[in-house]
Amino acid sequence: MKTNTFRPLVLSAAGLLAVSTAFGNAFTAPDGPVRKEVKEVRPLKAVLKDAKAIDAILQKAYAKHEVTPLPAADDATLVRRAYLAIAGRIPSYEETLAYLENDDSAKLSALVDHLLDSPAHDSATFNWWADLLRLQTRQRGGNQVGAGEAYVHWVKDAVRQNLPFDEVARRLITAEGYPWEDGAVGYYLRDAGMPLDNMSNTTQVFLGTQMVCAQCHNHPFDKWTQMEYYKMAAYTYGVRDRVNNPKQRELQQAFYAKTRGLSREERAKLTRSREFQQLRRATGEMMRPLQYGADRTERKLQLPHDYQYEDAKPKDVIAAAPIFGQAIAPAEGEDAVDAYAQWMTASDNPRFTKVIANRMWKRVFGVGVFEPVDDLRDDTVPSNPELLEHLEALMVRLDYDLKQFARVLYNVKAFSREASAEEITVDKPYHFPGPALARMSAEQLWDSFVTLALPYPDERLLDRARLDYRMEQLAVYEEKMEKLDAKKLTGLAKKGAKASKAIAAKMERIQKQMAEAAENDDREAMARLRREYGQVRNEQRTSFAKLVMGDDFDVRSLYGYGRGNGASAKRDPRWAGFSSQLMRASELPTPAPPGHFLREFGQSDREVIENASREASVPQALTLLNGVIYREVYRQNSPLSENVVRAQTPKDKVRVLFLSILNREPTAEESETCLVELKEALAQVAPQPKVPEHLKGEKRKKYLRYLEKKRQTQQTYGPVAKAYQGIAWALLNTRQFSFVQ
């Protein structure tokens, strides 16, 4: 990936941001095509025309419902709102100044284009997808082969490449093979062992239709029957989350051959023998990495044993049928899954386009044209039917390009108005006099702290070298296994069974020693034995793969060890000394572990679709009062600290704090209050001595540098620094900081 040099944002005379140098003229996504800038794909003139059409529809609604649109927001509010909405974080001090100091009337449109083209937008959009698809770095299905990580990176690549929404949906639904062949198979592995739930998750995400209740009985609050649920689920029920590898069948036949000609008693005795069981376990271990993926089979779906309705009998085999519209007829060369994906994402599907258009509207304005966005019913009444119909048509016309669609919405006048503090309720339509006032999401809040604490936060990306290496090695392992016949594989398994027996004895011995150490409360011995046990267990895991691949093969890579260290930060001098965990939320494991800042502030646990929360809580207040994140924000080389130190006067420093944290100028009263707070600390600083007149030339320059260094030291450490940190702490604990206005 290209590393780009940061430059402050500047505006041309024409009013367009000259930002191509900030992130390169194009961005190349991993394994993807060169991505064009948004203005290359579609001219701004066309975008503004579409935005004006939406303005007109909203204006009609204002008149009809006697709604007064809110006043235009000021520049400081707009730059902060745009960054939080599009980039997922507050603007930096430099980015804030660049916008506020520019007088061009087209600067908001230009900023929108710049942000949509930036890696910051990719980060924020990934978080949106992660909530929608319940992404988990360590998901249950296929975790043994890194399927969760592969799925996460597949979604990141789709975002970077700006794949159209309908294309993303089709690729997820039709994914098949191993994670190293197609990371999108994580869509099925995410719901491993739960194919019926996978279908109801699909309809909720892509059709805004909640069918989960109909899995066990007819839906009590909607029209869906249990029969309709099962007919819909039949399309993808044949997709198994365990791959039926031909090699596995060969091995089964080889084992069956050993029992051929034996009596029932002899066969039972053989298959129960320890040697036979060890051999089967050994071959199972060799095949284990090749078990996880999405495999299309002829498996048929049956009704449950307790089906209670008169239209069929329990355990009847069910034929696939859509929940609405005409029957799906697969085209030539298509199977039922392909046809199902085409039906799901068709532009004339009555719900697919409507739902994504509404989701995107909510992402920009905080409230959907209909709510909830994922519980669309026949009796759902949108707050503005004309607007919803227009948004659907626009989405189709833009070929489901979410970036271009959002680009139109961010240029709608309502986005530039003051935020509405009106309480949003389901029984009262919201007519969008301005965006809804909202608390920051967990990811926005974390990423905003990271912006204050870390230079170039958008460029500190998780290093995918380790994952790529693991996927490459798994592909090599698969290829080698395919070349082994059953006889050779069984021979290797016999060797593996013997080795495994010896390793198992070693593990048993260590377990006994651990029990003795625990009884004697010998903590040092316990720690040592745990390490030993882990090493032996890893030896057991890798011994079978080593038999297949040979001693030269890096077998540890199959289990996520080996080349690559996870964070490019460890190799980049720009982040030397910064915590390896100080990265944007999109680059951390998803979801974050319990107790992490992100989880405390409502990040989804990724168990349920869009399960994040923005509700305030006592633990959040305590985290903002005393959180360890402040250590990073206040450290000497954080962007916030460096900008404060560079400012010359106390008044300038207060201004830097406000522009960095709240992204606005302090009022005269705020500035005066802060200076009063600083007075005592400033009184302890000795005045700078005058430069002796006899010092000339280089000596004079050297002495001035010494004075400047001394000044910076005084303001970086001691009571003065603590005083400025106190002001920063106060600003970070205001509602102005934690809300998107």
Residues covered by each model-derived region:
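Bacterial N-terminal signal peptides that target proteins for export
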Residues: 2-13
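Bacterial N-terminal signal peptides
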Residues: 12-21
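N-terminal pre-domain segments of enzymes
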Residues: 25-59
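Post-BTB helical module
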Residues: 84-85
